[in-house]
């Protein structure tokens, strides 16, 4: 690695998150649940790590990929849409993409969609030829149009994309959609999904080799312990041996059953991790199949 591309030597890890927006609070909750705490500076943009040498930078979400690329931050929590847009832009300009997605975080889900005025009779993508498409994601859209061999004009806007067709500056839009309420309010309807997005943990492709390496490995393990347990519960019950096969068939989203030491009651003590919703109906089905003393326990964190 040349000196110009080498990562700066530091003994503290830096994470960038959105200063204010829909990903801010979920990102802070995740990091706090991983055991991190901070002392906030006067300007409220830099938070000094207290529990661990892991500092937090509060910035605009579209600055996060660049801060990682420049080595200013080691990690960033950002929407996949923003990360992919800047990566696509760099590739289209012949620049390397020095960062990567390390983990999907399963919050901030949305979709990048093509949406047309409600009065359109939509049939297929051939209708896009020659049309003007307003978007804040020109590089992703350009790649998609190129892949589908569609010649259309991209109208780049930094915001308020939904109003472009009503203003006459575009025929349709390509924008993020969560519930679809904003589209409906502007008499638009989604027709094609370009990509799915969620919050991701991004980092350099070239990982640090100094004191930050151990911190990074530890933090990734903790994040895995939080994210992988999302919507998971520990299920415990008693059952006779002859009922275990039937009970296992009722738990397709569970880990293999673990039998605990016999306490002399004549029934087996069993536990498993379920990775889906355990409703009252499921518990009643398990009870009818032979499970006794059913308990559902919330699991906050785990090291696998």
Curated annotation (Swiss-Prot):
Return the broad EC class: transferase
This entry carries the following GO cellular component terms, namely: cytoplasm
- Mainly resides where? cytoplasm
Provide the protein's localization.
Answer: Cytoplasm
User: What keywords would UniProt list here?
Assistant: Amino-acid biosynthesis, ATP-binding, Cytoplasm, Glycosyltransferase, Histidine biosynthesis, Magnesium, Metal-binding, Nucleotide-binding, Transferase
Reactions listed under catalytic activity: 1-(5-phospho-beta-D-ribosyl)-ATP + diphosphate = 5-phospho-alpha-D-ribose 1-diphosphate + ATP
EC code(s) of this entry: 2.4.2.17
Task: Give the highest taxon in the source lineage.
Answer: Bacteria
Q: Which residues cross the membrane?
A: none
Entry GO MF terms: ATP binding; ATP phosphoribosyltransferase activity; magnesium ion binding
Note the Gene3D superfamilies from the entry. Answer: 3.30.70.120, Periplasmic binding protein-like II (3.40.190.10)
In its UniProt entry, what is this protein called?
ATP phosphoribosyltransferase
Source organism: Xylella fastidiosa (strain Temecula1 / ATCC 700964)
């Amino acid at each position: 690695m040349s000196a110009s591309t080498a990562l700066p030597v530091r003994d503290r890890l830096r994470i960038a998150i959105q200063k204010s927006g829909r990903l801010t609070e979920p990102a802070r909750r995740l990091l706090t649940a991983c055991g991190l705490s901070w002392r906030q500076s006067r300007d409220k943009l830099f938070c000094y790590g207290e529990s661990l040498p892991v500092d937090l930078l509060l910035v605009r979400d579209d600055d996060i990929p660049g801060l990682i690329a420049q080595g200013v931050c080691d990690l960033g929590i950002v929407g996949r849409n923003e990360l992919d847009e800047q990566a696509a832009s760099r590739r289209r300009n012949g620049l390397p993409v020095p960062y990567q997605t390390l983990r999907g975080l399963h919050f901030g889900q949305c979709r990048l969609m093509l949406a047309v005025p409600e009065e359109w009779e939509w049939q297929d993508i051939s209708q896009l030829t020659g049309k003007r498409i307003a978007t804040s994601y020109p590089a992703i859209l350009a790649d998609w149009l190129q892949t589908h061999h569609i010649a259309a004009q991209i109208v780049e806007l930094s915001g308020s994309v939904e109003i472009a067709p009503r203003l006459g500056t575009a025929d349709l839009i390509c924008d993020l959609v969560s519930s679809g309420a904003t589209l409906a309010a502007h008499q638009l309807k989604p027709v094609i999904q370009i990509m799915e997005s969620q919050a991701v943990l991004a980092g350099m492709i070239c990982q640090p080799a100094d004191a930050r390496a151990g911190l990074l490995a530890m933090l990734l393990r903790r994040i895995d312990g939080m994210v992988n347990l999302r919507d998971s519960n520990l299920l415990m019950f008693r059952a006779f041996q002859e009922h275990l096969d039937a009970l296992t068939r009722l738990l397709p989203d569970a880990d293999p059953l673990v039998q605990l030491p016999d306490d002399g009651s004549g029934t087996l003590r069993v536990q498993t991790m379920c990775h889906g919703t355990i409703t009252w109906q499921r518990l009643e089905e398990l009870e009818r199949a032979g499970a006794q003393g059913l308990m559902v326990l919330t699991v906050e964190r785990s090291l696998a």
